[in-house]
Amino acid sequence: MINLKKISGLLLAAAMVFGLGSCNSQKGNDALKVTILYPNWSEGIAMSHLAKVALEADSFEVELINLEPGLIFGELSKENSKGDVFLDAWLPHTHAPYWEDYGDDLVMMGKIFEGGTTGLVVPSYVPINSIEELNAHKEQFDGEIIGIGSGAGIHAATLRAIDEYELDFEQITSSGPAMVASIQRAVRDESWIVATGWKPHYKWANFDLKYLEDPKGVYPTDYIGVVSRKGFEEDKPEAARFFKNFKLSEEQLYALMDAVDKNGEEAGAKAWYKANKALVDGWK
């Protein structure tokens, strides 16, 4: 006689094993999926695409999502964040307002680069050297400071600079690429331009530029850090180890940005990874 109770028990046990296996498989798959949030800034674009290329070489599935910095900090602070990590946090100054708002719900994983600077930039042929000299040459600059997105920390710092130095200038909101295009046109025509700038950025290699002196100390020095959502390291330990070890010298970061600028985001990152595979694989 067929023992229905025994068969039912076997079926239940099999179902439980299959279910647990599916759960473990899903967890394993999720551990190999990483979502990187990044801003439209040259170093953020370059580093994020390098991370994508390097992790995909180890069978990770990587998604890149472009957002303004404020939205990135806010998204990563959510309990059910759609993102995992952000490689371009400028702290402790430039992104300080975002860290004050969201830092308690974020994890600082490490520092990629020390010595990030921001300020107002002019071509070297412009014969002024200080922010304090801008008002005397308002007409040559058309009364405009060419900026980037309003969500960027340097945008807020420049509003403070306008106030601190009592500048009769307007900050023009654009984007990182649009700002570079404006500098390129001005340099081509040898016209005057003042723009928000930062290092590291590939524009310093492409154009002969200089910072204007900032005697009031509006623009500080920062490090570039890796910020993640809470629980990222527990959920995806292999990916987390890679990001915690992600470090670049100034020379390496400039070379990476230059490769991306000249060859495109994916191709440039792949070329730089191939040439520096030992370095990058050492982060894994």
Per-region residue spans from a language model:
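Short helix-initiation/N-cap motifs at beta->coil->alpha
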Residues: 41-42, 63-76, 171-182
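Short beta-strand->loop
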Residues: 105-113, 192-196, 205-220
